[in-house]
Amino acid sequence: MAAIKVHGSPLSTNTLRVLATVYEKELDHEFVLVDMSIGEHKKEHFLSTHNPFGQVPAFEDGDLKLFESRAITRYIACEYADKGTQLIYQDSKKMAITSVWMEVEGQQYEQIAAKLAWELVYKPLLLGMSADKAIVEENEPKLAKVLDIYESRLAQSKYLGGDCFTLADLHHLPTLHYLFGTQVKKLFDSRPHVSAWIADITARPAWLKALALQSQE
């Protein structure tokens, strides 16, 4: 039995973020499907055992139990630094720059992208509801401004953190995947350095393995 367990749903952006990290590190693990359609993540057993906030993913590595996807990915990258892809830098200055862009993803990009993904993907597909046009119209120009900054950064560097693929890039993958099936795709395509970066990171075998789990859902 694998010491590492990932509890979640492959439809969840946060679960995909952790799974992509596990695959990049080529770690033996067990994926435990959480049936969110019946609210399994809100039931007492899950709340008391895995995540008191009733969200996915939850993560186990032996006796260690974690939740919050970015905390999990950072742990994996540090604990298994000698395995698979090196997702963090050992050099403190390079890692500081990578950490800046990890924060940018969580605090600038994701705050906007998640709202758009909810309106344009999750509401229509999962809830049968129409997108709130006002929210979409408010957030599209906000995302465009963030992507202008990304375009400038990626004109100087192949990846956000530097010359190597790191967590700063990986963390973007799940929301990018969903937004690329919407009208928002044009904002990424119109910026050549951003577009090239996305083509690179979305073609990674580890990411494709994580996405393949959706076909089993």
Predicted regions located by residue number:
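A generic structural-conservation signal
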Residues: F31, D163, F188, A210-L211
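C-terminal helix/juxtamembrane-tail motif
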Residues: A206-E217
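GST-like fold's C-terminal all-alpha helical module
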Residues: W101-A203
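Positions that flank functional sites
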Residues: M36-S37, F165, Q216
